[in-house]
Amino acid sequence: MKNVTDSFVSLVNWPFAGSFGLNTDILATNPINLSVVLGVLIFFGKGVLSDLLDNRKLRILNSIRNSEELQRGAIERLEKARARLRKIEIEADQFRVNGYSEIEREKFNLINSTYKTLDQLENYKNETIHFEQQRAINQVRQRVFQQALQGALGTLNSCLNKELHLRTISANIGMFGAMKEITD
């Protein structure tokens, strides 16, 4: 069996008669074959390898450009968002300050209106008291006048005769008519 294996190995290493073969044993090959193979690989493979590397380089550069554009866009959006945030914070501070000043203004207005209402109530109270005093005074006057009138009538009735009595009544009616015209 060893001979069969050796014969296959020897076939691989030795080319057939009239054909071209490649000796894979590095130590058994000569430098000319190696240089020819390397030269052919470099000559024909250089273009393919160069194209592959150029394509890869272009894809990497495009990816970098796209990433840079995306980064610039993200930075612009971030700056816009920061500007909007600053604007909103300023507006919020203004609303807060305006809210506090509005609260203070409303508080001041409420206090003032309360004082005005209290003053009006005090005036109404004083007017009511004055009105009631005047009414009480008028009632007392009327009662005193009625009592004086009744007393005078009683005195007159006891002292006067019928004719004098009629003249006195006529005079009093005339006085009441004159008083009524003055008060109207």
Curated annotation (Swiss-Prot):
The record's section on InterPro entries has:
ATP_synth_b/b'su_bac/chlpt (IPR002146)
Q: How does it sit in the membrane?
A: Single-pass membrane protein
Q: Which domain of life is it from?
A: Eukaryota
| Residue ranges crossing the lipid bilayer per the database entry | 27-49
What would be one Pfam family of this protein? Answer: ATP-synt_B
Subcellular location, record wording: Plastid, Chloroplast thylakoid membrane
Disulphide connectivity of cysteines: none
Q: Which UniProt keywords apply?
A: ATP synthesis, CF(0), Chloroplast, Hydrogen ion transport, Ion transport, Membrane, Plastid, Thylakoid, Transmembrane, Transmembrane helix, Transport
Q: Please explain the role this protein plays, according to its UniProt record.
A: F(1)F(0) ATP synthase produces ATP from ADP in the presence of a proton or sodium gradient. F-type ATPases consist of two structural domains, F(1) containing the extramembraneous catalytic core and F(0) containing the membrane proton channel, linked together by a central stalk and a peripheral stalk. During catalysis, ATP synthesis in the catalytic domain of F(1) is coupled via a rotary mechanism of the central stalk subunits to proton translocation.
Q: Which family does it belong to?
A: Belongs to the ATPase B chain family.
- Protein name according to UniProt: ATP synthase subunit b, chloroplastic
Which species? Citrus sinensis (Sweet orange)
Task: Please state the gene responsible for encoding this protein.
Answer: atpF
